[in-house]
Curated annotation (Swiss-Prot):
Family: Belongs to the PC-esterase family. TBL subfamily.
Organism per entry: Arabidopsis thaliana (Mouse-ear cress)
Chain segments annotated as transmembrane: 19-39
Region (Disordered): 62-101
Compositional bias (Pro residues): 63-96
Keyword Nucleotide-binding: no
Domain of life: Eukaryota
Gene this chain is encoded by: TBL32
Protein name stated in the entry: Protein trichome birefringence-like 32
Residue ranges of the motif GDS motif: 180-182
Topological category with respect to the lipid bilayer: Single-pass type II membrane protein
Misc: Contains 2 motifs that are conserved in esterases, but it is unlikely that this protein belongs to the catalytically active pectin esterases.
Residues in compartment: Lumenal: 40-451
Annotated Pfam families: PC-Esterase, PMR5N
Length: 451
């Protein structure tokens, strides 16, 4: 018996039994210690998502993992500051020769005539040897001199005083030209009379070469010139002394024949008007005066005048520098042949008139408002090369007293009938010097130096 109990087989069984009870005891002890957690885990497992174990990787099948915590977005940068305002465009350079500026709203061409013996006349007729005998009224017997005493006073500002020294200094090394008809020649002579007393006798001279008259200022290396071109364009009236042609013909677009004499001028003053007022259509030559068979067409005065101004502006743009030169255009000079225009007797004219017209609304009947409109349209101040308009028309229209009338050199002997009726040969186109045209030059001075 003893042998059987301690046989190797029994000894193995006892060891297995001992091991079994040891494991069982361990399980029971663990169950006691972790029983609560085990129960909680078991309950949780019934509701937990299925987890697949693969090596050391855990994959959640039915729910994505919560996103990783993110940092709060950085604060938005402040809105950019608005760009600084663009600087204003640079002001255009002042016109050539300008030394100042006319006040805003000042129209020197609107005003009235006031008598002023303290400052008028600006020179004496006898002191200026350059006045043509057609304009020396006192020398030719005019009994009154009141026409010399009137000063133009603008309504809203004052007119700068004419300063011969300023004008002469501005002309150093320069060339000034007046281009047009006999009315522009009168303005040219007036300017020379306003300047000549400031120039030494041996340093000035005047010479005429056909259509061109040149006043030389040797100490200033300067010239003031006049060029006869009553239409500005080439015409059959271009002879400076023999131009009384009844059948006037103007060559279309032909400015270069005259224009070659104007090149190099620093200041140009144009005028043209009276010669276009024929009462008929204008004859316009298409081609050359040298053509054996001439093609001539007729145009209304308005259309022909517009053509001339367009051609003038085209020449200016091509030949003048807007930064270094200045161009002016004097509007129409009125005549006074109809006394009824100012409330006078019918059949009377400027003869024996000694005072200006007082009606400030007066407009000279011979001055075409249609042609004035053409001037305004073609000489636009906003153009690439602005032409300064000297609007002398209305202010001159008041001056029925300032014409040469009968007090001038007569080129032909007067008949008995004319002598018996002085009004019949009275010149109501041209103006006595000194007189109205000195005012034109005061206005020219203002616009040249104070634009």
């Amino acid at each position: 018996m003893t042998t059987a109990l301690f046989s190797p087989s029994n000894r193995r069984k006892r060891r297995l039994t001992h091991f079994f009870f040891t494991v069982l005891a361990f399980i029971l002890l663990a169950a006691f210690i972790y029983g609560h957690d085990f129960i909680s885990f078991s309950r949780r497992s019934l509701h937990s998502p299925t987890i697949v174990h693969q090596s050391a990787i855990v994959v959640v099948v039915d729910e994505p993992p919560p996103p990783p915590p993110t940092s709060p977005p950085p604060p938005s940068p402040p809105p950019p500051s608005p760009p600084p305002p663009s600087p204003p465009p640079p002001s255009p350079p002042p016109p050539a020769f300008a030394v100042g500026k006319t006040p805003e709203g000042c129209d020197v061409f609107k005003g009235n005539w006031v008598k002023d013996w303290s400052t008028r006349p600006l020179y004496r007729e006898s002191e200026c040897p350059y006045i043509q005998p057609q304009l020396t009224c006192r020398t030719h017997g005019r009994p009154d001199s009141d026409y010399q005493s009137w000063r133009w006073r603008p309504d809203s500002c004052s007119l700068p005083s004419f300063n011969a020294t300023v004008m002469l200094e501005s002309l150093r090394g320069k060339k000034m030209m007046f281009v047009g008809d006999s009315l522009n020649r009168g303005m040219y002579v007036s300017l020379i009379c306003l300047l000549h007393s400031q120039i030494p006798e041996n340093s000035k001279s005047m010479d005429t070469f056909g259509s061109l008259t040149v006043f030389s200022l040797k100490d200033y290396n300067a010239t003031i010139e006049f060029y006869w071109a009553p239409f500005l364009l080439e015409s059959n009236s271009d002879n400076a002394t023999v131009h009384r042609v009844s059948d006037r013909i103007v060559r279309k677009g032909s400015i270069n024949k005259h224009g070659r004499h104007w090149r190099g001028a620093d200041i140009v003053v144009f005028n043209t008007y009276l010669w276009w007022r024929t009462g008929f259509k204008m004859k316009i030559l298409e081609g050359s005066f040298k053509d054996e068979k001439k093609r001539i067409v007729e145009m209304e005065s308005e259309d022909a005048y517009r053509m001339a101004l367009k051609t003038m502006v085209k020449w200016v743009k091509k030949n003048m520098d807007p930064l270094k030169t200045r161009v002016f255009f004097a509007t129409m000079s009125p005549t006074h042949y109809k006394g009824e225009d100012w409330g006078g007797e019918q059949g009377k004219n400027c003869y024996n008139q000694t005072t200006p017209i007082q009606d400030m609304n007066h407009w000279p009947s011979d001055c075409s408002k249609t042609l004035m409109k053409v001037i305004g349209e073609e000489l636009d101040q906003r153009a690439e090369f602005p032409v300064t308009v000297l609007n002398i028309t209305q202010l001159s229209g008041y001056r029925k007293d300032a014409h040469t009338s009968i007090y001038k050199k007569q080129w032909s002997p007067l008949t008995k009938e004319q002598l018996a009726n002085p009004a019949s040969y009275s010149d109501c186109i041209h103006w006595c010097l000194p007189g109205l045209q000195d005012t034109w030059n005061e206005l020219f001075f203002a616009k040249l130096f104070y634009p």
